[in-house]
Amino acid sequence: MLFNTISVIGLGYIGLPTSAMFASKEKKVIGVDVSQHTVDTINSGKVHIVEPELDLVVKKSVNDGFLSATTVAEPADAFLIAVPTPFLPVKDKDSIPEPDLSYVKSAVKSVSEVLKKGNLVILESTSPVGATEQMSLWLAQERPDLTFPHTHGEDSDIRVAYCPERVLPGSVIREIEENDRIIGGLTKNCSAAAIELYKIFV
């Protein structure tokens, strides 16, 4: 697969460094965030979070024209969803905490509006078992004109995979490039596409 344009949904502690690393390899990266302040800050070549070396990579990537940010999703070859998945409030002390996937669902809706045949969608957010399949279901509901791996397997129009972030604040720029990655695709083709994408900088 050719990944000329990569979109990262969610420009926080994982999404922004990920965007910057792809852009540093001279890939066109479109970062998407709901915060206009975040978007404006990044487009001015600055950062809104504290992370060593990130400001230098972002500034160069923006100045070189490889990184831009927006509040609305735009067409791309690959989409990485890196939004928060906080725990929902527990009802009582015996309840098991459950993750809130509403941000993922909102990101899916945003991506679905510009999705096209051949695209790859990766969930990077820390998520529970079954979340990647759920994401594929949500995408299919939004785009019945496209086929997805949970129904069409290897022949699907869209590739879907999971690659959870595995970095520690303070060392993100180094770890995002050096740490081993665990990639799980809904099919072999999905996994292969995700591996090819991350090989750009890992």
Q: Where on the chain are the PLM-derived regions?
A:
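Conserved N-terminal Rossmann-fold NAD(P) cofactor-binding segment
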Residues: L2-T5, K28, V34-A78, A82-E98, ...
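Glycine-rich Rossmann-fold phosphate-binding loop(s) that bind the pyrophosphate
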Residues: L11-G12
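Internal alpha-helical scaffold of NAD(P)-dependent oxidoreductase catalytic cores
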Residues: W138-C163, V167-V202
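Gly/Ala-rich phosphate-binding loop of Rossmann-like dinucleotide-binding domains
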Residues: S19, A23-S24
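Glycine-rich, N-terminal phosphate-binding loop of Rossmann-like dinucleotide-binding domains
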Residues: A82-V83, S125, L186
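N-terminal Rossmann-fold NAD(P) dinucleotide-binding loop
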Residues: G15-L16
